[in-house]
């Protein structure tokens, strides 16, 4: 039985090890752009990052999911969508999902996103935004299944083509 838990900054290194392992094992490197540890740490330190882990019954960590609460920070994907300032403040970025190969097949990306969505709804966030490489059928299928809508395709993260997806969770 695998459970999803929300954790604090004290488990960030552990989560980042998963990001590194997944990054190194990517068959199509363009599909996954691993941010540096300092990027995750910045958001956690600011109190604007949410970190989720998937752990098995032996407490082995097999997946991580990171949410950024960007506010008016220039990294907010809402700027790409020409959102107004009040909308930007209600955006959460479903930023990074990484699942170790031995934990795949359990829909962990989906489950972690669902946990985050429930927390974000409770916190009053209205817009969930994420990016997916246009050819990454796995992530694309995952966000479509959760009700996200593709709004834009553009270069992000130093020249990588990405689709920007959005889901409105509060009317």
Language model segments and positions:
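Conserved acetyl-CoA-binding loop-helix of GNAT-fold acetyltransferases
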Residues: 96-99, 105-118, 141, 145
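Conserved GNAT acetyl-CoA-binding A-motif
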Residues: 120-132
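C-terminal "cap" of GNAT-fold acetyltransferases
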Residues: 155-171
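Conserved beta-strand-loop-alpha-helix junction that forms the acyl-donor binding cleft
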Residues: 104, 130-140, 158
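Conserved active-site alpha-helix within GNAT-family acetyltransferase domains
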Residues: 122, 134-153
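Active-site rim helix/loop that mediates acceptor-substrate recognition in acyltransferases
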Residues: 29-57
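Conserved acyl-donor/pantetheine-binding loop and adjacent beta-alpha core of acyl/acetyltransferases
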Residues: 63-96
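A short beta-loop-alpha structural element at the N-terminal edge
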Residues: 1-18, 28-30
């Amino acid at each position: 039985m695998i459970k999803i838990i929300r954790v604090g900054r004290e488990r960030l290194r552990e989560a980042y090890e998963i990001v590194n392992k997944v990054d190194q094992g990517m068959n199509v490197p363009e599909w996954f752009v691993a941010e540096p540890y300092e990027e995750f740490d910045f958001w956690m330190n600011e109190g604007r990052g949410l970190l989720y882990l998937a752990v098995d019954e032996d407490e082995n960590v097999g997946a991580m999911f990171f949410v950024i609460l960007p506010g008016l920070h220039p990294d907010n994907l809402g700027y790409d969508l020409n959102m107004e300032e009040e909308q930007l403040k209600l955006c959460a970025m479903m930023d990074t999902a990484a699942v170790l190969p031995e934990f795949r097949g359990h829909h962990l990306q989906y489950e972690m996103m669902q946990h985050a969505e429930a927390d974000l709804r409770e916190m009053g966030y209205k817009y969930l935004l994420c990016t997916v490489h246009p050819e990454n059928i796995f992530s694309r299928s995952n966000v479509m299944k959760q009700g996200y809508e593709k709004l834009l395709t553009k270069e992000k993260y130093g020249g990588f083509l990405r689709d920007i997806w959005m889901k409105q969770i509060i009317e």
